[in-house]
Amino acid sequence: MKRMIALDGAQGEGGGQILRSALSLPMITGQPFTITGIRAGRAKPGLLRQHLTAVKAAAEICRATVEGAELGSQRLVFRPGTVRGGDYRFAIGSAGSCTLVLQTVLPALWFADGPSRVEVSGGTDNPSAPPADFIRRVLEPLLARIGVHQQTTLLRHGFYPAGGGVVATEVSPVASFNSLQLGERGNIVQMRGEVLLAGVPRHVAEREIATLAGSFSLHEQNIHNLPRDQGPGNTVSLEVESENITERFFVVGEKRVSAEVVAAQLVKEVKRYLASPAAVGEYLADQLVLPMALAGAGEFTVAHPSCHLQTNIAVVERFLPVRFSLIETDGVTRVSIE
């Protein structure tokens, strides 16, 4: 019988990242775990609908036995079984992030007995989680280099707080993992600005695009009007395609916040990324830790190692026989497998 791993949910930033990482890993390794103090660092601690959906999805996919899977629970015991490929559907029941649920369970399906499809309904454009286009256009091309073949499709948008969106991913078992090397970003090839609108006047998007164009030379400027029943909502994105990597940044519009202020927040974030020669942005760095650990080799550079990144590394090192090295030189941190 494998040893139970005990985790402290207050570790790092005390949010949901440690729980998501902890759920992904035992599905792969077969090691049970217990976690206490779930989301202890948040104003409303314990499991929210999004986290509970991730727990139930993980349990269904690997036939786990679970204790503490209920709203508000701050303690969870998870004993995994065998991962099974198949066609899965999960509903969050709120505007909680579809992509965060997908990112919890998809790594386990890289080791399944056959191809799978996972569909999640909930929020797709959430200020605290990556939109599906980030997964599709940024993360999945990098996963393909590592040897992971999955394809995410956005079936319907669902903005916060209403939700109602649907995202699906098709994934195949991995034959072998490759080392990812992302030491340098390379020269910029092009930049693309994009605005999504649902039940919001078009002039909002035009002002947002104008703000982006005032700071960057945009090769593309796209405005997409979605059906009103998918809103109200507004997301502004800017994609930076470089020689070695494509990064994508976004800001979700808010009520009583002007179009110019929303777009200016995005401009600030992109300028911060471009000010450093690091290849990887802060959020993408979090997502590369687990696949790189499974490959057993690789490296990337990031300007600022976030608390999320360091929490993710700490959890991965509890479950897998790997050690990460973080070396800072001239304002850039090189993250690699020792």
Curated annotation (Swiss-Prot):
GO molecular function: ATP binding; RNA-3'-phosphate cyclase activity
Signal peptide range: none
Primary enzyme class: ligase
Residues holding ATP: Q103, Y283, L284, A285, D286, Q287
Superkingdom of origin: Bacteria
Active-site residue numbers: H308 (tele-amp-histidine intermediate)
Enzyme Commission number(s): 6.5.1.4
Record keywords: ATP-binding, Cytoplasm, Ligase, Nucleotide-binding
InterPro entries per the UniProt record, alphabetical: RNA3'-term_phos_cycl_insert, RNA3'_phos_cyclase_dom, RNA3'_phos_cyclase_dom_sf, RNA3'_term_phos_cyc, RNA3'_term_phos_cyc_type_1, RNA3'_term_phos_cycl-like_CS, RNA3'P_cycl/enolpyr_Trfase_a/b, RPTC_insert
GO cellular component, one term: cytoplasm
SS bond list: none
Cytoplasm recorded as keyword: yes
Catalytic activity: a 3'-end 3'-phospho-ribonucleotide-RNA + ATP = a 3'-end 2',3'-cyclophospho-ribonucleotide-RNA + AMP + diphosphate
Recorded family membership: Belongs to the RNA 3'-terminal cyclase family. Type 1 subfamily.
Protein name listed in UniProt: RNA 3'-terminal phosphate cyclase
